[in-house]
C-alpha cells in the first residue's frame, strides 16, 4: 500500500517538468498522419529505392489530407507538406520512367494550374524540358503566370525567367517571350536586358536557319530539275535502242506480217483495194531499208570485233 501512496503523492511530469496541482495538463498536439506518410515515402524513395511504394505512400498521404479536410484539419499539416508530397511523387514517377504522367498526377490534387506551388511548377518545367518536351507545360505555366495572385509571390520573377529560357525559347515562341519580359514588373532592369538579349540572339539564329534552309532547297530543286531534263533524252534513247534491237531480232517476214496486221486493226484499210497498193509498196521499201541498215550495222560490228 505504501507504493500506492507514494505513487499518488508523486508529482505529475509533463513536457515542461513537474506539474503543480494548480496547473492544467497541457495536451500534446496530435501529429498529422500525412506527415508520417511523407517521411515514409521519402525513406522509400531515397534509402530503399522502392519508387512504386514511395508513389503509393504519397497517394495515401494525399488521401489522408483529403479526409481530414472534411472535418477539421489537424495542426501540423501545411502547404509545405503537400508540396513535399508532390516533390517525392514527381521524383518517383521520373525514376520509373513515367515522367509523362507527372503533370496530370500533380493536377489531380491541385485541380487547376494556378494553385500549383512554385517549387512544384519549377520541377515540372525542369523535367519536361530535360526530356525535350517543353510544349507539355506551355499552357500550364502560362496560366500560372497570368494569375494575379501569383504575380505577387517572390518566386514569380525567377519562375517567369525560367519559363522563358526552358520553354518559350526552345519552342521558338519569341514574341510571347518578349511580351512576357517587357510586360512584367517582376524583372529587374538588368535581368530584363539580359533576357531580351537572349531573345534577340535566338531570333537572329532562327532567321539564319530559315534563310539557310531556303538556300539549300534551291540548288536541290535546280539539280533535280536539270537531272530530270538530262536523264529524259537518255531514257528515250534507251527505249528506242531497246525497241530497235527487239525489232531487229524478229525475222523480216514476221515483222512485215505484224505491220500488216497492225495496219488492218488500226488504220482499217483493205489490202486488196487499188488505193492500198501504194501504201504497201512504201511499207515494203521501208522494211527493206531497215533490214539493210540492220545488216550493215551488224557487219560493221563483226569487222570491229
Swiss-Prot record:
It is a single-pass type II membrane protein. Signal peptide: none annotated. Keywords: Disease variant, Membrane, Peroxisome, Peroxisome biogenesis disorder, Protein transport, Signal-anchor, Transmembrane, Transmembrane helix, Transport, Zellweger syndrome. Residues 268-305 are peroxisomal matrix. It comes from the Eukaryota. The keyword Protein transport applies. The chain crosses the membrane at residues 247-267. GO terms for biological process: protein import into peroxisome matrix; protein import into peroxisome membrane; protein to membrane docking. GO terms for molecular function: ATPase binding; protein-containing complex binding; protein-membrane adaptor activity. Residues 1-246 are cytoplasmic. It is found in: Peroxisome membrane. GO terms for cellular component: cytosol; peroxisomal membrane; peroxisome. Its main location: membrane. Belongs to the peroxin-26 family. Peroxisomal docking factor that anchors PEX1 and PEX6 to peroxisome membranes. PEX26 is therefore required for the formation of the PEX1-PEX6 AAA ATPase complex, a complex that mediates the extraction of the PEX5 receptor from peroxisomal membrane. It is linked to Peroxisome biogenesis disorder complementation group 8: A peroxisomal disorder arising from a failure of protein import into the peroxisomal membrane or matrix. The peroxisome biogenesis disorders (PBD group) are genetically heterogeneous with at least 14 distinct genetic groups as concluded from complementation studies. Include disorders are: Zellweger syndrome (ZWS), neonatal adrenoleukodystrophy (NALD), infantile Refsum disease (IRD), and classical rhizomelic chondrodysplasia punctata (RCDP). Interacts (via its cytoplasmic domain) with PEX6; interaction is direct and is ATP-dependent. Interacts with PEX1; interaction is indirect and is mediated via interaction with PEX6. This is Peroxisome assembly protein 26. It comes from Homo sapiens (Human).
Amino acid at each position: 500500500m505504501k507504493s500506492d501512496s507514494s505513487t499518488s503523492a508523486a508529482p505529475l511530469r509533463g513536457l515542461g517538468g513537474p506539474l503543480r496541482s494548480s496547473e492544467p495538463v497541457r495536451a500534446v498536439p496530435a501529429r498529422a498522419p500525412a506527415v508520417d506518410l511523407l517521411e515514409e515515402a521519402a525513406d522509400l524513395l531515397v534509402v530503399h529505392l522502392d519508387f512504386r511504394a514511395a508513389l503509393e505512400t504519397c497517394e495515401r498521404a494525399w488521401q489522408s489530407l483529403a479526409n481530414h479536410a472534411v472535418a477539421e484539419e489537424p495542426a501540423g499539416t501545411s502547404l509545405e507538406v503537400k508540396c513535399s508530397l508532390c516533390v517525392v511523387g514527381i521524383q518517383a514517377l521520373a525514376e520509373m520512367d513515367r515522367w509523362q504522367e507527372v503533370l496530370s498526377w500533380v493536377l489531380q490534387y491541385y485541380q487547376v494550374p494556378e494553385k500549383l506551388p512554385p517549387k512544384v511548377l519549377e520541377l515540372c518545367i525542369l523535367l519536361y524540358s530535360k526530356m525535350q518536351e517543353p510544349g507539355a507545360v506551355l499552357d500550364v505555366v502560362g496560366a500560372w503566370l497570368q494569375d494575379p495572385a501569383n504575380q505577387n509571390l517572390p518566386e514569380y520573377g525567377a519562375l517567369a525567367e525560367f519559363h522563358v529560357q526552358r520553354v518559350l525559347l526552345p519552342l521558338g515562341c519569341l514574341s510571347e517571350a518578349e511580351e512576357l519580359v517587357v510586360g512584367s514588373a517582376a524583372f529587374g532592369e538588368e535581368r530584363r536586358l539580359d533576357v531580351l538579349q537572349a531573345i534577340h540572339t535566338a531570333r537572329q539564329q532562327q532567321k539564319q536557319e530559315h534563310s539557310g534552309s531556303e538556300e539549300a532547297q534551291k540548288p536541290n530543286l535546280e539539280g533535280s530539275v536539270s537531272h530530270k531534263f538530262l536523264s529524259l533524252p537518255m531514257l528515250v534513247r534507251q527505249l528506242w535502242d531497246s525497241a530497235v534491237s527487239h525489232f531487229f531480232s524478229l525475222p523480216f517476214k514476221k515483222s512485215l506480217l505484224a505491220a500488216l496486221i497492225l495496219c488492218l486493226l488500226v488504220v482499217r484499210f483493205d489490202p486488196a483495194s487499188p488505193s492500198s497498193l501504194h501504201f504497201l509498196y512504201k511499207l515494203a521499201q521501208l522494211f527493206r531499208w531497215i533490214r539493210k541498215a540492220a545488216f550493215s550495222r551488224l557487219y560493221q560490228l563483226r569487222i570491229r570485233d
